[in-house]
Amino acid sequence: MDPRDVIIKPWITEQSTDQMEENKYTFVVAKDANKTQIKDAVQKLFGVKVKQVNTMNMKGKPKRLGIYQGKTPSWKKAIITLTDDSKAIDLFE
């Protein structure tokens, strides 16, 4: 897979911003991507050294608008831990 197909977008929340101090960055990734593909994609796109990749599948939430019901799509989140000697990812600064 192309690295741009693996990493969809950064996930910026209050909790993920706090984790950046510990060299941990959060991304929304492709649902069919595995940890090895995610690690390679981050290293190629941002030029950093990855120590660890944690992934989790996020279930879509039910939504309702008047009489219409539906749900948000399910997605996959990855928390990337960088090595201590690696530089920070510029995208988050």
UniProtKB/Swiss-Prot annotation:
<dbReference type="GO" id="GO:0005840">
    <property type="term" value="C:ribosome"/>
</dbReference>
<comment type="similarity">
    <text>Belongs to the universal ribosomal protein uL23 family.</text>
</comment>
<dbReference type="GO" id="GO:0019843">
    <property type="term" value="F:rRNA binding"/>
</dbReference>
<keyword id="KW-0687">Ribonucleoprotein</keyword>
<keyword id="KW-0689">Ribosomal protein</keyword>
<dbReference type="InterPro" id="IPR013025">
    <property type="entry name" value="Ribosomal_uL23-like"/>
</dbReference>
<keyword id="KW-0699">rRNA-binding</keyword>
<dbReference type="GO" id="GO:0006412">
    <property type="term" value="P:translation"/>
</dbReference>
<protein>
    <recommendedName>
        <fullName>Large ribosomal subunit protein uL23</fullName>
    </recommendedName>
</protein>
<dbReference type="Pfam" id="PF00276">
    <property type="entry name" value="Ribosomal_L23"/>
</dbReference>
<dbReference type="GO" id="GO:1990904">
    <property type="term" value="C:ribonucleoprotein complex"/>
</dbReference>
<comment type="function">
    <text>One of the early assembly proteins it binds 23S rRNA. One of the proteins that surrounds the polypeptide exit tunnel on the outside of the ribosome. Forms the main docking site for trigger factor binding to the ribosome.</text>
</comment>
<dbReference type="GO" id="GO:0003735">
    <property type="term" value="F:structural constituent of ribosome"/>
</dbReference>
<dbReference type="InterPro" id="IPR012677">
    <property type="entry name" value="Nucleotide-bd_a/b_plait_sf"/>
</dbReference>
<dbReference type="InterPro" id="IPR012678">
    <property type="entry name" value="Ribosomal_uL23/eL15/eS24_sf"/>
</dbReference>
<keyword id="KW-0694">RNA-binding</keyword>
<dbReference type="InterPro" id="IPR001014">
    <property type="entry name" value="Ribosomal_uL23_CS"/>
</dbReference>
<comment type="subunit">
    <text>Part of the 50S ribosomal subunit. Contacts protein L29, and trigger factor when it is bound to the ribosome.</text>
</comment>
